[in-house]
A protein has these predicted regions:
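Cytosolic juxtamembrane helix and N-cap/initiation of the first transmembrane helix
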Residues: 1-17
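Membrane-interface helix-boundary motifs at transmembrane edges
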Residues: 1-4, 67-74, 101-104
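Membrane-interfacial loop-to-transmembrane alpha-helix junctions, especially the N-terminal start
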Residues: 8, 73-82
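Core segments of alpha-helical transmembrane spans in multipass integral membrane proteins
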Residues: 17-19, 26, 40-67, 81-89
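Membrane-interface helix-loop junction between the first two transmembrane segments
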Residues: 24-36
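Non-cytosolic membrane-interface motifs at loop->transmembrane helix junctions
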Residues: 34-45, 74-75, 101-113
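Membrane-helix boundary connector in multi-pass membrane proteins
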Residues: 70, 85, 91-109, 127-128
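Membrane-water interface at the C-terminal end of transmembrane alpha helices
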Residues: 116-136
Length: 138
């Protein structure tokens, strides 16, 4: 069970770091210069800030309640499942609508690879906990 806990905490920690890093992305990459209408800059920044706050908060909550996941607390499993669903959604969206690699190849493939990594790190422990929970009920 220890390796699943390590995967869980590493995946949640990377998710938290992505959320915190995302606060700075619009300014690091000069998003405003790519947006043709000045009136859209502030709303896009608001959406990014809200997403960053929610991803960071959800990831931190999942980290802080990690022990409850492995004793199979149902409420915590729902939060964990939601975080996992978010990363699965991210991977699926990237497959359907890939980031154009001509803008920055390493960034495009790095984002996709990182998303798959976090998804796997969170998915494997989730399957393990869910399967032991079902076996426990029988």
């Amino acid at each position: 069970m220890k390796k699943y806990q390590i995967m869980y905490y590493v995946g949640a920690a990377i998710s938290l770091l992505v959320g915190l890093w995302h606060f700075t992305v619009p300014w690091m990459f000069g998003w405003a210069s790519y947006i043709p209408y000045e009136t859209l800059v502030v709303p896009i920044n608001y959406v990014n800030l809200c997403f960053s706050f929610l991803l960071s908060g959800l990831s931190l909550t999942v980290i802080l309640w990690g022990k409850k996941v492995f004793v199979q607390n149902p409420e915590v499993l729902y939060l964990y499942g939601f975080l996992l669903a978010l990363w699965i959604f991210r991977v699926v969206v990237e497959v359907i609508y890939p980031c154009p690699p001509e803008s920055n190849v390493w960034m495009s493939y790095g984002q996709f690879g990182g998303s798959v990594l976090v998804c796997v790190l969170l998915l494997v422990p989730f399957i393990r906990v869910a399967s032991t929970r079902k076996n426990r009920k029988k």
